[in-house]
Amino acid sequence: MPGIVLIGAQWGDEGKGKATDLIGTKVDYVARFNGGNNAGHSVVVGDESYALHLLPSGIINPNLTPVIGNGVVVDPEVLFEEIDGLESRGIDCSHLKVSEAAHIIAPYHRTLDKVTERFLGKHKIGTTGRGIGPAYADKINRVGIRVHDLFNADHLHDKVEASLHQKNQMLVKLYNRRPIDVDQTTEELLKLGERLKPYVANTGLILNKALDEGKTVLFEGAQATMLDVDHGTYPFVTSSNPTAGGACTGTGVGPTKITRVIGVSKAYVTRVGEGPFPTELLDESGEWLRQQGHEFGVTTGRPRRCGWFDAVVNRYASQVNGLTDIVLTKLDVLTGLKEIPICVAYDVDGERHDDMPTDQAAFAAAKPIYETMPGWDEDISDCHSFDELPATCQAYVKRLEELSGCRISVIGTGPQRDHVIQINSLVD
C-alpha cells in the first residue's frame, strides 16, 4: 500500500521529472492534487519530449492510471488542448480520470486574473494570468463551479448567474469592462462538459481502493513548498497547498496511507515572479546559472531568478513536508565553479536566524550568511555512482544533506534520463 508524495522543496521548477522517471515504472496510479495549468513540467520518453501543464506525468504511460484530483482547478479548454496534442502524437489519453469534485476554471476567471493584475500595478502578485487564483477564490467563497455541475443545464445556469453577479459589478464599475453574459457562458461550459464527461469519476474512491488493494500511488504536486498558500512566502504564493498535506486534501486519501514523502531540490535555487529571495544573484553569477541551467519557464517562458543553494529553505521544507528523501537535481550545472557558496543561515537586522522567519517582513529583509565549498571542473554526467563523483562534489552533496536534515537519495547529473545517481530506492 505505498502512497508516495512527490513535492518541490523550493520555489518550483526543481526538475520533479527526474524523480517521476525513476518512480513512474513502479507505480500504478499518478495523481495530481493541487494547482492548475499554471505549472509546466516536461516528460521525456525516448527521443520524445512532452510539455504538460495540467495533465499528470503518468498520462504518457499506458500501463498506469493518471488522475486529476479534487484539489486541482481544471480549465477544460487547456485540458482538451493537451489531450489533442498528445493524441496527435499517438498517445492514448482514454485512461485519464478527472475528479467530479474538482473546480472548473471558467473563461471569466482568466479575464479577472488579467485585469486584476493590471489594476494592481506595482503591487501585483505576478500570476500567470490563467485564472487559477480567481477559481480558488470562488471555491473558498462557495460560489465555485465543480466538474459535476457541468452536466445539469438549469443547475449550471444558476451557479454561473450567482458567480457572475458580483464579478460583473466589479468588471463594469471598477475595471471599466463589459459585463460577461450568463447565458453565453453557461452554453460554453455545457459544451465543454459534454466532452469532459467520459473522463469524470469518483477519483477519491478509486485511489483509496487502489491503495487498499496494495497498488502504488504517486501523488504529484505542482509548484512547490515555498509557494504554498499557508506555508510559503505569502502573499507571493500560489492559491493552493503544494506541500505534502495537500496530497491528502487534494485527493481524498487519508494521511495514514502515505508512506514516503520525496522533496525535489535543485543544487542551487530559482524563482519565477515576485517575492523575496534571499540568495538571489543579480550579477553575472546569476546570469551564468540561468544560461548554464537553461532557466526559463515552461509555462510562461519567463527567465527565472537564480541564486545559491538556501539550506534554510530546505530545512524548512523538510520540516513542513516531513520529507523522507531528497532528489537533488542539476548538480552538473555547478561544474566549472571554483567556489560554491551555500546559505546556512540569515542575518536579519543584525541577528542570526538558522530557521525560516515566520514574519514575511523579516524574511524579505534577510541577508544570506554563506559557507563556501570548493568546486570541481570534471564532467559528472557519466557518473553513475556516488563514489564516481569528484571528491569536492561529494563533499558539496554531503554538506547539503547535513544542512537539509534529510537524506539525499537521488542526484541528477545531467539533462538526460540516464544522467542520474540513485543512492536509495524511492519506492519501498
Curated annotation (Swiss-Prot):
Chief location bin: cytoplasm
GO cellular component: cytoplasm
Catalytic activity: IMP + L-aspartate + GTP = N(6)-(1,2-dicarboxyethyl)-AMP + GDP + phosphate + 2 H(+)
Positions of GTP binding: 12-18, 40-42, 304, 330-332, 412-414
GO biological process: 'de novo' AMP biosynthetic process; IMP metabolic process
EC main group: ligase
Pathway: Purine metabolism; AMP biosynthesis via de novo pathway; AMP from IMP: step 1/2
Binding of Mg(2+), residues: 13, 40
Names of required cofactors: Mg(2+)
Protein residues bound to IMP: 13-16, 38-41, 128, 142, 223, 238, 302
Coiled coil: none
Residues annotated as catalytic: 13 (proton acceptor), 41 (proton donor)
Enzyme Commission number(s) of this protein: 6.3.4.4
Similarity-based family: Belongs to the adenylosuccinate synthetase family.
The protein, known as: Adenylosuccinate synthetase
Organism (species): Bifidobacterium longum subsp. infantis (strain ATCC 15697 / DSM 20088 / JCM 1222 / NCTC 11817 / S12)
Gene assigned in the entry: purA
